[in-house]
Amino acid sequence: MNFVKNKLVVVGAGMVGSAVLNSVLSLNLLSEVVIIDINDNKAKGEALDASHTTSFAYSPNVKVRAGNYEDCADAQIIVITAGPSLKPDDKLDRLVLADTNVKVTDSIMKNICKYTKDAIIIVVTNPVDIATYYCQNNFDYPKNKIIGTGTLLDTARMRKIIGKKYNVDSKNVHGYVLGEHGGSSFTSWSDVNIAGIPFNQLNDIFKDHYKVDKDEVDKEVRDSGIEVLKLKGYTSAGIAMSVSRLVKAMLLNEQSILPVSSTLEGEYGINDVALSIPCIITSNGIEKKLEIPLSKDEVEKLNKSADNLKSIIKGLNTNK
């Protein structure tokens, strides 16, 4: 397959798709961006609006347009954002979207597969772990080329929370949130550190600042997305930046280690469910899944997260 160099397709022109479109353009790495939506006028409007930004200084002359699934044929990266999102008055659990959005994802994947099985697909649609599992296991598409955003945003939230409490730049906070992008996610505290200082020493070293409580941080991370949803009606900026981070790692073949969702195949003794663990991201997608050292309690939490997701997968109603 001959790709158009640095061509990206966004499927879905809703709040998230629009934010993703503008976020990836700001990378200044793309030659062409196509947006697809069931509402063609919405896609055209988003593309036209975004295209006007390319006239500003230091913006490359990117081709931005609305298109259709044929545009996937020579795309390097495809981002799936389509599907209903949680509303503030919904039951505030991403898993309630499972049946509906798996059907949406099924339709999208069937259309993509008509034209390519070479592009890297980034799955954003919630519940992202369920959607990622479905995409990886039902279309004979290379699994390493399908990546769910997973707990990448949760990890950014955790780092921001800890950085703020200790009054340090959150980019100097290291560690991961693992498992489900949702209620059973957890921070791998055994790996969290600031400048190499392990978490269990941080309260002593930063004794003039807030004493960080693990359970409090985990709850704040899990509640962050819901809090944004309640306040503004939807989430968009954080997840769009998460997508941009992945796109940059792929286009530049960075070999970056990021916590993303993929079907586990024996890692930590877990099989046949997609959830987030650290993965090496390259121009091929997921190059390698890493079993970082976890405490016994953290492995138990990962298994609990897996069991939670498996129960949803088992109960899916995928009648088309």
Curated annotation (Swiss-Prot):
Organism annotation: Clostridium acetobutylicum (strain ATCC 824 / DSM 792 / JCM 1419 / IAM 19013 / LMG 5710 / NBRC 13948 / NRRL B-527 / VKM B-1787 / 2291 / W)
Function: Catalyzes the conversion of lactate to pyruvate.
EC number, as in UniProt: 1.1.1.27
Pfam family, one: Ldh_1_N
Binding residues annotated for NAD(+), in chain numbering: 16, 37, 42, 69, 107, 124-126, 149
Localization terms from the record: Cytoplasm
Gene name in the database record: ldh2
Binding site for beta-D-fructose 1,6-bisphosphate: 159, 174
Protein name: L-lactate dehydrogenase 2
Regions that span the bilayer: none
Family recorded in the similarity comment: Belongs to the LDH/MDH superfamily. LDH family.
